[in-house]
Amino acid sequence: MGCASSLPDRNSGTLSGLSNSENAVPADAKNLRVKLVLLGDSGVGKSCIVLRFVRGQFDATSKVTVGASFLSQTIALQDSTTVKFEIWDTAGQERYSALAPLYYRGAGVAVIVYDITSPESFKKAQYWVKELQKHGSPDIVMALVGNKADLHEKREVPTEDGMELAEKNGMFFIETSAKTADNINQLFEEIGKRLPRPAPSS
């Protein structure tokens, strides 16, 4: 289950609302705006990660995302750079897979999420890595996230497997828990640090 029911209807994404703008659009070198898309199997907690990051909330009883949801959040990094994330949370159900390229086209960041208790979701994460390598922007920042780290007693995907997949594909890896908020802010802070910076104007 996702956290989609906690998101207002006005934030639901539609195809007409998609933008193919630049991957990261700076107002200046210290103010960045970037389109971020979350990909992964249904039920891995993509919406819960977004809701925890944007609103500091967690809803274990919510419904799955249908289509896609849109939210935005701005953070300040230690170097005084501000990053505005325009976050597209895509549906994980198989019938929506064909729509995913419409959401990650033009994205500067892709966050691929799997559930550490679900080997099947890890296989799907590998699929999304390949899809992004084929069709994503060449300079896209990619993160691999093993979610539900609080369920360590039910773990079926070793941490080492996630680390290996990320290392092989030039991604960074982190394990999170949307339920406890563990590593959620750290995930987005690390993404912000890895975004390309515009050259200073002369």
From Swiss-Prot:
Residues holding GTP: 40-47, 89-93, 147-150, 177-178
Subcellular location: Early endosome membrane; Endosome membrane; Cell membrane; Endoplasmic reticulum
Topological type in the membrane: Lipid-anchor
Segments of this protein annotated with the region Disordered: 1-20
UniProt-listed CDD domains: Rab5_related
GO BP of this protein: early endosome to late endosome transport; endocytosis
Function: Endosomal protein probably involved in endocytosis. Probably not involved in vacuolar trafficking.
The protein's name: Ras-related protein RABF1
Gene designation per UniProt: RABF1
